[in-house]
From Swiss-Prot:
This is Diaminopimelate epimerase. Keywords: Amino-acid biosynthesis, Cytoplasm, Isomerase, Lysine biosynthesis. It comes from the Bacteria. InterPro entries: DAP_epimerase_AS, DAP_epimerase_DapF. Homodimer. Its EC number is 5.1.1.7.
Length: 276
């Protein structure tokens, strides 16, 4: 199987052109492949499954490192776009990339960053995510965890997110907190969890724990969700810089109800080939 290793601010991917359907990849193989010591290592594996040349439409499948399927990955879409450019599968600076749940208009900016446009964020999580009926269709809930009250803001940006606002972005127990939230039947189908520190009216800092992959270096959909919370609840500017440990993403949301743009880099690391 031929593949390309790519990343966006350290959020790394293995991307496979599977349009000819030659690669029948099993969950066991995905887990083996994702191992950073005995495999290739990645946060997500992305298969390009279908291509409509007339409309520049590419259908993809996204798998987390634990082999569970993901239905949104903005950093991944950005890397797929760069893959398509490198492999000369597209000539223009625009493509529509997504799955059966929807497409994202993706384009190259003048300064060689990649912009992904997504549907308007939705400020609640549906009942299949939350186990307790009193939490269903809520915009936010307050939980008491480790003797502290924590406000969880819910946002759906193609996948579900829980955003926690804290001044202590380097919270040492972030991984412990995330695992607690995921294992204590609050979110039976799991959820992406982020801690956000608001630094200015146009700047936030983010730490992310992705469902199916664990703590990652960056996450495009988390950046979108956190920016949505910052704009909607805290009245931040419509253009926000989202800082991760390895760099920045930029989120632009003109107004509530409009599509949202997430802008950032995508980098090719190497090409390879591996046997099943």
């Amino acid at each position: 199987m031929k593949f390309s290793k790519m990343h966006s601010l350290g959020n790394d991917f293995v991307i496979v052109n599977n349009i000819d359907k030659k690669n029948n990849i099993s969950p066991i193989f995905i887990k083996k492949l994702s191992d950073r010591y005995t495999g290739i290592g990645f946060d997500q594996l992305i298969l390009i499954e279908f291509f409509c040349k007339k409309y520049f439409y590419f259908k993809i499948k996204i798998f987390n490192s634990d082999s569970s399927e993901s239905f949104q990955c903005i950093n991944g879409i950005r890397c797929v776009f760069m893959f398509l450019k490198i492999k000369k599968l597209i000539k223009k600076n625009i493509a529509f990339i997504g799955n059966n749940l929807g497409l994202s208009k993706t384009l190259m900016t003048k300064n060689k960053l990649i912009c992904v446009k997504i549907k308007p964020p939705r400020f609640y999580i549906e009942k299949d995510i939350l186990v307790n009926p009193k939490y269903n269709n809520k915009e936010k809930i307050i939980l008491r965890i480790f003797k502290k009250k924590i406000t969880c803001y819910f946002v759906f940006v193609g996948n579900p997110h829980c955003i926690i606002i804290s001044k202590n972005i380097e919270y040492n127990n972030f991984s412990l907190l995330s695992k607690y939230l995921l294992k204590n039947n609050i979110f039976p189908n799991k959820i992406n969890i982020s801690i956000m520190n608001i630094l200015d009216f146009d700047l936030i800092k983010l730490k992310v724990y992705e469902r199916g992959s664990g703590e990652t270096q960056s996450c495009g959909s988390a950046a979108a969700a956190a920016a949505a919370v910052a704009i909607y609840y805290k009245k931040l500017n419509k253009k926000i810089k989202v800082n991760f440990s390895r760099g920045n993403l930029y989120v632009y949301w003109e107004k509530i109800g409009n599509f949202m743009s997430i802008i950032g880099p995508a980098n090719h690391i190497y090409d390879g080939k591996i046997n099943f």
